[in-house]
Amino acid sequence: MVDPNLVTFVLTIVNILVLFYLLKRFLFKPIGEFMENRKNEIKQNLEDAEKERQEAEKLKEQYYEKLRGAKSEAQEIIQQARQREEEIIKEAKQEAKQEADDMIARAREEINQEQKKAIESLRSEVSDLTIQITERVLNDTIDKDQQKKLVQKYLKEVGRVS
C-alpha cells in the first residue's frame, strides 16, 4: 500500500508543475511580451527624443543668430518709438491745455448765464412779494401792533421762500 503522505507529496508536485506551466503560458509569456514591447517603445521614444533635442538645439542656434541680428534693428525701433512718444506727449499736452481753456471759458459763460437767471428770478420774486405785501396791507386796515406782527410774519415768509 502506498503511503498517503507520498501521494499527497506527488500530487502537490504535480499541482505545482501544472500551476507553473499555466503561469508560464498565460501569465509570464504575455508579461514578457508586454515588457519587451514596452522596452522597445521606450527605446524608440528615447531615440525620438534625442532627435527632437538635436533639432531643438539647431533651432535654438538659429534663433540666437536671428536675435543677434535683430538687436540693432530693435535699438533703432526703440529710438523711433521714443521720439514718437515725445511727439505724442507734446501734442497731448497741447490738446489738454486747449481743452482746459475751452472748458474754463464755457464754465465762465455758464456761470454768468446762471447768475443772470438767478438775479432775474430774485427780482421777479421780490416784485411778487412786494405786490403781495402791498395787497395785504391795503386790504387789511390794522393798528400799529398788528402791522408790526404782520410785517414780521411776512418777513419770516420771505425768509422761507428765499
From Swiss-Prot:
Entry annotated with the keyword Transport: yes
InterPro entries in the record: ATP_synth_B-like_membr_sf, ATP_synth_b/b'su_bac/chlpt, ATP_synth_F0_bsu_bac, ATP_synthase_B_chain
Species assigned in the record: Natranaerobius thermophilus (strain ATCC BAA-1301 / DSM 18059 / JW/NM-WN-LF)
Protein name per its UniProtKB record: ATP synthase subunit b
Transmembrane segment boundaries: 6-28
Function: F(1)F(0) ATP synthase produces ATP from ADP in the presence of a proton or sodium gradient. F-type ATPases consist of two structural domains, F(1) containing the extramembraneous catalytic core and F(0) containing the membrane proton channel, linked together by a central stalk and a peripheral stalk. During catalysis, ATP synthesis in the catalytic domain of F(1) is coupled via a rotary mechanism of the central stalk subunits to proton translocation. Component of the F(0) channel, it forms part of the peripheral stalk, linking F(1) to F(0).
Pfam families named among the record's database cross-references: ATP-synt_B
Matches recorded under NCBIfam families: ATP_synt_b
One GO CC term on file: plasma membrane
Keywords: ATP synthesis, Cell membrane, CF(0), Hydrogen ion transport, Ion transport, Membrane, Transmembrane, Transmembrane helix, Transport
Membrane topology, from the record: Single-pass membrane protein
